[in-house]
C-alpha cells in the first residue's frame, strides 16, 4: 500500500543544534510546549514520591524527561530545573552524598570511559529505589531515601520491617555507611523477555504507603557502595557477603575491557536474575574519600543502560494509504528512533476510526515497540502537543471493486492493485516493487491495471530512472507473465477467493468461471455464502468484464474463446 502523499499533513521540520534534533517551532510555541511538559513531569514526579503511585511507566517518564532536556537545550534554556529528581520532602542529611551515575550511550562511549582507568568492576544496574543505610555500634540506626542526594526522608521504620536487610552487623561493618538499591525480589526474572515491570514504581509505592507491612517482605537490597570501605574490592565484597549482603558479591565481576563489560551486560540481560535491571554499572575499586562525594560528580563510575523495549517517538506527520481492497489505513511518520537495532520511522495506526479514537496529531509523543517479526507497533500516546492540526482523510468511497482503472481520485488504490498483481501471490513479477510501478504509470499513463502488457521494450527502456539492466529485466518479467496460469491471472484481478479455493474449483477458463453458480462457490474451502456473494458481485462488475475481454485480446491463457 502506498501512502496518500497528497494528504500528508503537518510534517514537522527538524534541524540539528549541538547534535540534538530540534522541532522547528516558533519561540512562543517552543516556550509553551516546554512549560507544559515540564509541569506534567513535575506532577507525575510529585505523585510518585508523595503517594507512591506511578501515573506513567518508569521508562516513559525517563524518556520524556530526556526529551524535555533536549528541547530546553534547543532553545538555549537552563536545564537545571528539569524535574528528573525526587522533590525534596525529607530533611534528614545523608552522612555521605549520593553521587548518581553518569550514563554512557554505547560501547564506544564505554571504551572511551574505561581508557586510563584501572581496577574496574561491573555490576547489574538494579532497578529500584536508592537508599542510605547507617550502622552504628553494630546496629541499623538510620535509613534515608536518596532525595536530592544530600538529604532525603527518614525511612528507618519501614526499612526495619524488610527481612532481607540485616539489622545488625559486626567487624568493619559495625560502624559503616552503605548505599544501595531496594528492589522487588523476583524469581528467575529474565530482563530481555519480561522487561522492567515498572519495578521502581512498585518499590516506591510499598515504601510510601502506611498500611502494607506484609508487602515489604517482597523487597530486597543490593549494596553498590561502601564509602570509605576496604580499598581492595574482593575484601569489600567478602565482608559484605558475610554481613548478609550476598548479592553484591555474587553479581560484581572484574573487567579489563569493554568486551568483558558487554559480555556481562548481555548475560544479565538474558539470564534469570533475582531482580529487575536496566543496564550495568562499571566502577573503579579506588574511590575518593567520602567527604568529597557530591551529587552528579561520581566520575569513578558510569552506567551503560539497556535499550528500552519501547521508545517514545515524536509524530512528524499523519499520512493515509489506500489498499487494493479500498481500505484506508493511517500511518504515523516519526522522527526516527532505534528499537532493537532497527531504525523505526513510521508506525501503522490502522483504520481512520482507530486513528480518531487515538487522537494523534503531528507533534504528539507516542510509545512504539516491536511486535512479531520486528513490525513497529503503537502502544500508547504519552504526550499530546498543544496544537491539534490534523489532516482530512480521503473519501471513503473506495471498496474492493473500485480503481481497476486509473483516475485522479484512484491513484493510490490503483498503485496498490499494481503492487498486488506483481506480488508472489499473483503473477510473481520479480523486481517490480511499488517504486517501479509508480515510475511506469507516471511515464506511460496506464489506462487500467493490465496496460503494462502493451508496453514495448523501447518504452520500458525510456522510463526515467530505469537502467538498461533494470528495463531488460522488467521486459522479460512482463513476457513471462503471459505464460502464467489462468488461476494466477484471476488472482491478479483480485477475485475474492483464496488460491486454494480456486484450485479446488478446477476452473481453467473465464468461460467456465462464468458458468459457476453462487452455490458452487460457497461450497469451496474457506468460502461460505458471504464470500460466494462477493465472487458473484466481482464477476458481474463491468470493469472486470471489460478487463477479461482485454486479456482475451492479449491472448492470455484461459480468456480466449
UniProtKB/Swiss-Prot annotation:
SUPFAM superfamilies linked to this entry: DNA ligase/mRNA capping enzyme, catalytic domain, Nucleic acid-binding proteins, RuvA domain 2-like
Class of enzymatic activity (EC top level): ligase
Keyword DNA damage belongs to the record: yes
Keyword Coiled coil attached: no
Reaction(s) the record says it catalyses: NAD(+) + (deoxyribonucleotide)n-3'-hydroxyl + 5'-phospho-(deoxyribonucleotide)m = (deoxyribonucleotide)n+m + AMP + beta-nicotinamide D-nucleotide
Keywords: DNA damage, DNA repair, DNA replication, Ligase, NAD
NCBIfam families recorded: PRK08097.1
Family per similarity comment: Belongs to the NAD-dependent DNA ligase family. LigB subfamily.
Identification of the protein by name: DNA ligase B
Organism for this UniProt entry: Salmonella gallinarum (strain 287/91 / NCTC 13346)
